[in-house]
Amino acid sequence: MHSKSRITAIGTYVPDQILSNNDLEKMVHTNDEWIVQRTGMRERRIASEEEYSSNLAIKAIENLCTTYKKNLEDVDCIIVATTTADYVFPSVACQIQQYFNIPHTLAFDLNATCAGFTYGLHVGNSLITSESHEKVLVVATETLSKVTDYTDRTTCILFGDGAGAILLERDENTPSFIAAHMGTNGDGGIHLYRTNLSTTMNGTPLQTNEKIVQNGREVYKWATRTVPKGIKNLLHTVNMQVDDIDWFIPHSANLRMIESICEKSQIPIQKTLTSVEYMGNTSSVTIPLALNLAIKEGKLNNGDTLLLYGFGGGLTHLGLIVEWNLI
C-alpha cells in the first residue's frame, strides 16, 4: 500500500452525563452483572438535549488543536464519519467548516456506521497520497442515545455518545499507513439498521420507529467470522505476522465479541485497546476513543505498529495497519 500521509494529531470528546448499568436497571429488566457478563460494559456517556453530533465533533477538534498546537486554516478536506448527523443535509462536515472558518476545503460526511472511522482514514490517506490534497481532518462523531430505544434491553445497554478527530498531513518520509483490507456484505444489512424513507429492505418489512434495530446474534456471528478472516488477509498482503503487531484496536462493539475475534486471530487480549468498558459502543468513535485513552495511559510509543479494524452496519468492514509516529 502506497502512502504519503502521516497522523499528526488526535483529539476526543465525550459528554459529561454518565449512564451506568445501575441506571439501566431502573429503565429495563436487566442488571449490572448481566450486562457486564455479556458486553463488558459498565458505563456509557450520553449527550444532553442541546448537544448534537456537530457539537461533539467541534469539541473533539478543539481538543486536537489545543493538545497538539494545530492550526486548521490550511485544511483542504474535512471527512466526517457519522450515522447521527444533526440534519439529513447540510452535512456535519459543512457545519465544522463554518464553525472553524476554514476557507478552502472539500467537506463531506460518510456513513459506514461502526467502520466509519477506518473508512475516513483510508479515504483521507488516499486523497493525500494521490496528491490532490495536503491536509485532511478526519472526524467520527455520534449521538446514538438520540436514536436508541430505551425500552429495548438488547440495544439500550450498548450505545453511547462521543467524538474523535485525527489530522492527516502530507509526509512522504514517515507515512503512517502500511496496508488496508476491506469488504462489504450488503445482504446482511437487515440485521442492523435504522429506517429513513423506505419501510422495507429487499421486500422485508422494517421496524419504522427510526431507532436502532439490531439482530445481535446475527451481527455477532458475522463479525466473529468476517473480522478474523480480514485480519489474516490484511497481514498476508504485507507479509506480516500477528507478532509484528504491537497493538490491536478493534471497534469496541462488545467485549465478548472482541475476545472471540482475538481468540480466532491468535491475538493476545493484552495487546488489545478498547473503549468499551466506560464508553460503551459509540459506533465510529470507539477506535479514536481507544487510541486517545492509550495515549493518556502511556501505552502508545512512536514506531508502534497498530492494527485498526472497524466493522458494523452495512454490513461492512475495513482494517488498517498503521505505524504510529505522532511526533
Swiss-Prot record:
<feature type="region of interest" description="ACP-binding">
    <location>
        <begin position="252"/>
        <end position="256"/>
    </location>
</feature>
<dbReference type="GO" id="GO:0033818">
    <property type="term" value="F:beta-ketoacyl-acyl-carrier-protein synthase III activity"/>
</dbReference>
<keyword id="KW-0808">Transferase</keyword>
<dbReference type="InterPro" id="IPR013747">
    <property type="entry name" value="ACP_syn_III_C"/>
</dbReference>
<keyword id="KW-0275">Fatty acid biosynthesis</keyword>
<dbReference type="Pfam" id="PF08541">
    <property type="entry name" value="ACP_syn_III_C"/>
</dbReference>
<keyword id="KW-0276">Fatty acid metabolism</keyword>
<feature type="active site">
    <location>
        <position position="251"/>
    </location>
</feature>
<keyword id="KW-0444">Lipid biosynthesis</keyword>
<keyword id="KW-0511">Multifunctional enzyme</keyword>
<dbReference type="GO" id="GO:0006633">
    <property type="term" value="P:fatty acid biosynthetic process"/>
</dbReference>
<dbReference type="GO" id="GO:0044550">
    <property type="term" value="P:secondary metabolite biosynthetic process"/>
</dbReference>
<feature type="active site">
    <location>
        <position position="114"/>
    </location>
</feature>
<dbReference type="Pfam" id="PF08545">
    <property type="entry name" value="ACP_syn_III"/>
</dbReference>
<comment type="function">
    <text>Catalyzes the condensation reaction of fatty acid synthesis by the addition to an acyl acceptor of two carbons from malonyl-ACP. Catalyzes the first condensation reaction which initiates fatty acid synthesis and may therefore play a role in governing the total rate of fatty acid production. Possesses both acetoacetyl-ACP synthase and acetyl transacylase activities. Its substrate specificity determines the biosynthesis of branched-chain and/or straight-chain of fatty acids.</text>
</comment>
<comment type="similarity">
    <text>Belongs to the thiolase-like superfamily. FabH family.</text>
</comment>
<keyword id="KW-0443">Lipid metabolism</keyword>
<keyword id="KW-0963">Cytoplasm</keyword>
<dbReference type="InterPro" id="IPR016039">
    <property type="entry name" value="Thiolase-like"/>
</dbReference>
<comment type="subunit">
    <text>Homodimer.</text>
</comment>
<dbReference type="InterPro" id="IPR013751">
    <property type="entry name" value="ACP_syn_III_N"/>
</dbReference>
<keyword id="KW-0012">Acyltransferase</keyword>
<feature type="active site">
    <location>
        <position position="281"/>
    </location>
</feature>
<comment type="pathway">
    <text>Lipid metabolism; fatty acid biosynthesis.</text>
</comment>
<dbReference type="InterPro" id="IPR004655">
    <property type="entry name" value="FabH"/>
</dbReference>
<protein>
    <recommendedName>
        <fullName>Beta-ketoacyl-[acyl-carrier-protein] synthase III 2</fullName>
        <ecNumber>2.3.1.180</ecNumber>
    </recommendedName>
</protein>
<dbReference type="GO" id="GO:0004315">
    <property type="term" value="F:3-oxoacyl-[acyl-carrier-protein] synthase activity"/>
</dbReference>
<dbReference type="GO" id="GO:0005737">
    <property type="term" value="C:cytoplasm"/>
</dbReference>
